[in-house]
From Swiss-Prot:
Transit peptide feature, positions: 1-49
Active site residues according to the UniProt entry: 411
UniProt binding sites for substrate: 343, 379, 383, 412, 440
Residue numbers binding pyridoxal 5'-phosphate: 304, 340-343, 440
UniProt-recorded name of the protein: Diaminopimelate decarboxylase 1, chloroplastic
Catalyzed reactions per annotation: meso-2,6-diaminopimelate + H(+) = L-lysine + CO2
Species this protein is from: Arabidopsis thaliana
Keyword Hydrolase among UniProt keywords: no
Single Gene Ontology BP annotation: lysine biosynthetic process via diaminopimelate
The entry's keywords: Acetylation, Amino-acid biosynthesis, Chloroplast, Decarboxylase, Lyase, Lysine biosynthesis, Plastid, Pyridoxal phosphate, Transit peptide
Family, as annotated: Belongs to the Orn/Lys/Arg decarboxylase class-II family. LysA subfamily.
Highest taxon of source: Eukaryota
Protein location: Plastid, Chloroplast
Disulfide bridge partners, by residue number: none
Length: 484
């Protein structure tokens, strides 16, 4: 099986139409397109010496954010004024992406991986928009799956099954049978998971390529809700149980082929030496596995690289920084590297766009109330996560700058998008965006309070606007009860 990333090209067919709603005189009219889906169904180095990169001379382009304020005070996405987009689409909260930024983010990983046999597996859980998946697949990406439906969606988007990795601590037998039939990699997470994979192999009549998910117990220094590789995690196996799993694989040669080892430390990681520390341990496990006669050829270091949510000018690790910490380790053992980026591929490509409903004060608290909410974007409420917030247009000259909680209309005190944000007092109807909303935002959206999931658009390379997901409607909700 070829492990290096393949570069596929399959253009989507476009069916453009101009939205009919009028724009204000000071705005230009922006056509919004609707996509019609096109569907297809050993050299030895010492571990200590190996952690220093030999690729540091590579020139990396400085990151230039796709959403930025211009000197005129307006927010632009790839040169297109966000306020103009708001006036050209349905008046409701929506997600707005930069398609070119998605491409640039993936290219950064591909550049970093030059010279390393690799699979870039996009973590579908971060954002499962079908058009985004098709775009990433067309650029040569693989997919990382944590449910049977994510596997089905990956197949619908045209991903090569041999570049897909099925993760999860509770994979069902039905989903494992599908994975076995399609030939995807499966990460073994527990004793019962291994038994189910064996059964799935027998049902499907196909041998399953498996990796062992081993917890290296390296502290990722992140929020406990997104730490996944410590000794008490619900994911993976403890290293002291490794021999039991190796013996079980040996006992089932027709059903299982052990091809690699996997770890996943967590998410929003901002120190790449943490990945290095984990990779050093994983190499030790791989050496032991090979000593027992297994032809292990893959090291999967997971994902989790963080981004600059604060927009405070922090210098964060790049994909090149990440890969350089493990490059020589991987090459020293002649391994194929699998990485599982999600947030770092898609988060900074998107804003959540809202209208200001009004401003109010209670006691010592000032509130900006918007039409978006925790139903559409739950990260701040769930993790107390910070996402940068700003207005899309210049405020009135007399607008006072003060501290606001930015809140939505959902009937929960936890319904906030940001707390204690210094912002100019906005007029009613003003546009307000929550930045870096491409990952774990729309994919975690709900219909709480019957807030229907919003539409999604992206800015194309030529500056045109394309709808990439329809808004959900009240009629969509009622359809679940038809015929009952």
């Amino acid at each position: 099986m070829a492990a290096a990333t393949q570069f596929l090209s399959q253009p989507s067919s476009l069916n453009p139409h101009q939205l009919k709603n009028q724009t204000s005189q000071r705005s230009r009219s922006i056509p919004v397109l609707s996509l019609k889906s096109t569907l297809k169904p050993l050299k030895r180095l010492s571990v200590k010496a190996a952690v220093v990169s030999q690729n540091s001379s590579k020139t990396v382009t400085k990151f230039d954010h796709c959403f930025k304020k211009s000197s005129d005070g307006f927010l632009y996405c790839e040169g297109t004024k966000v306020e103009d987009i708001m006036e050209s689409v349905e008046r409701r909260p929506f997600y707005l992406y930069s398609k070119p930024q998605i491409t640039r983010n993936l290219e950064a990983y591909k550049e970093a991986l030059e010279g390393v046999s690799s699979v870039i597996g996009y973590a579908i859980k971060a954002n499962n928009n079908l058009k985004i998946l098709e775009h990433l697949r067309s650029l040569g990406c693989g997919a990382v799956l944590v449910s049977g439906n994510e596997l089905r969606l990956a197949l619908r988007a045209g991903f090569d099954p041999t570049k897909c990795i099925f993760n999860g601590n509770g994979k069902s037998l039905e989903d494992l049978v599908l994975a076995a039939q399609e030939g995807v990699f499966v990460n073994v997470d527990s004793e019962f998971d291994l038994n189910n994979i064996v059964e799935a192999s027998r049902i499907s009549g196909k041998q399953v390529n498996v990796l062992l998910r081993i917890n290296p117990d390296v502290d990722p220094q992140v929020h406990p809700y997104v730490a996944t590789g410590n000794k008490n995690s619900k994911f993976g196996i403890r290293n002291e149980k490794l021999q039991w799993f190796l013996d079980q694989v040996k006992a089932h040669p027709k059903e299982l082929k052990l091809v690699g080892a996997h770890c996943h430390l967590g998410s929003t990681i901002t120190k790449v030496d943490i990945f290095r520390d984990a990779a050093v341990l994983m190499i030790e496990y791989i050496d032991e596995i090979r000593r027992q006669g297994f032809e292990v050829s893959y090291l999967n270091i997971g994902g989790g690289l963080g981004i600059d949510y604060y927009h405070a000018g922090a210098v964060l690790p790049t994909p090149m920084d990440l890969i350089n910490t493990v490059r020589e380790l991987v090459l020293s053992r002649d391994l194929n590297l699998i990485i599982e980026p999600g947030r770092s591929l898609i988060a900074n490509t998107c804003c959540f766009v809202n209208h200001v409903t009004g401003v109010k004060t209670n006691g010592t608290k000032n509130f900006i109330v918007i039409d978006g909410s925790m139903a559409e974007l739950i990260r701040p409420s769930l993790y107390d996560a910070y996402q940068h917030i700003e207005l899309v247009s210049p405020p009135p000259a007399e607008a006072e700058v003060t501290k606001f909680d930015v809140v939505g209309p959902v009937c929960e005190s936890a319904d906030f998008l940001g707390k204690d944000r210094e912002l100019p007092t906005p007029p009613q109807g003003a546009g307000l965006v929550v930045h870096d909303a491409g990952a774990y935002c729309m994919s975690m959206a709900s219909t709480y309070n019957l807030k229907m999931r919003p539409p999604e658009y992206w800015v194309e390379e030529d500056g045109s606007i394309t709808k990439i997901r329809h808004a959900e409607t009240f009629d969509d909700h009622l359809r679940f009860f038809e015929g009952l």
